[in-house]
């Protein structure tokens, strides 16, 4: 049952078609990389949940709720809806097993999804365990989670992938 999930998350064994677009991660030295690109490149440490050739998922260190995950394309683009259609499809397929793992790992009604894109100029999806719509209120105060708590959350989600 878990083998298809691991196959999908592992680009070497995935039988899903990769996005056909010729988008590539930005390599220009003229513009600074976004914080998400620096996380993907390993310049900034993160609590990685999953990764494949095109996408990267990691914990938000200022979570709305415990289990808040960010899913980002490795290609830098400011607006999620500027991605080619095949990338949009693939990012949701990449996020789906992570969302299901979040639902299993935390006491919630479902995993909420949000696309806002105002704080970081790099397309991303928020996956948040929720019990009601107020749990996705990004105006509420958020505090930085401790490294110990983030590590526990990371392990909890990964255990359900």
Residue ranges and their predicted role:
Residues 2-9, 30-161:
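HIT superfamily nucleotide-processing domains
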Residues 10-32:
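Arg/Gly-rich low-complexity intrinsically disordered repeat tracts
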